[in-house]
Regions:
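N-terminal prepro-regions of secreted/extracellular proteins
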Residues: 1-76
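Mature secreted bioactive peptide module from preproproteins
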Residues: 61-155
Length: 155
C-alpha cells in the first residue's frame, strides 16, 4: 500500500511539473514577428495573439539584391484553422516603398472588406472584417520597419 501511495505521489508531482512547464512556455510566446533583413531568406515565427491563441508568421524573401535591405518580401500571417492573410512588400533603403497583392483564405467563416494600405514609409496595414457565424471582428496584419527589421503582428 505504501508503494502505491508513493508511486501515486510521484505521478502527481510529475504531472504538476509538466503542466507548469507547458503553461510557462505558452506565456513566453511573442506577440510580434521580427524579420531580420540582413539575414534574409525565409523566416518563420510562432506567436500568441491577444486571446492566447497560437499563430504563425512566415516572411519570405522574393528577390535577392546586392544591397542589404532592398528587395521584395512575402508576409503571411496564419491563424491555424481559422484564416491566413498577407501581402507583398517592396523595401528600399530600410523603408517600405510599396505594398501590393494582398491575399487571404479562410478555413471557417469569411473575410469581408479587405483593404491594404501603406500608412507611411515604415508601416503597412492589411485590414479586414472576419465573420464567423453570429460574431465578427475587425482584424488584419500590420508590418512595420524598425531599422533593418520588418516587424509583423496581428492588427
Amino acid at each position: 500500500m505504501k508503494v502505491l501511495k508513493k508511486s501515486n505521489a510521484v505521478f502527481v508531482m510529475i504531472m504538476v511539473l509538466i503542466l507548469n512547464i507547458m503553461s510557462v512556455s505558452a506565456t513566453e510566446l511573442p506577440k510580434e514577428a521580427v524579420y531580420d533583413l540582413k539575414k534574409g531568406g525565409t523566416q518563420q515565427f510562432i506567436l500568441q495573439d491577444e486571446e492566447g491563441k497560437v499563430t504563425e508568421v512566415v516572411i519570405e524573401e522574393i528577390t535577392t539584391n546586392a544591397r542589404i535591405a532592398n528587395g521584395n518580401y512575402k508576409v503571411s500571417y496564419k491563424n491555424p484553422g481559422i484564416w491566413e492573410a498577407g501581402f507583398y512588400v517592396e523595401i528600399s533603403a530600410n523603408k517600405i516603398a510599396s505594398a501590393y497583392s494582398p491575399f487571404h483564405s479562410v478555413a471557417t467563416g469569411m473575410i469581408l472588406y479587405p483593404n491594404l494600405a501603406r500608412n507611411s514609409e515604415t508601416k503597412v496595414t492589411y485590414s479586414f472584417l472576419y465573420k464567423q457565424a453570429a460574431s465578427n471582428y475587425s482584424t488584419g496584419v500590420i508590418a512595420e520597419m524598425s531599422g533593418t527589421d520588418l516587424v509583423v503582428r496581428q492588427k
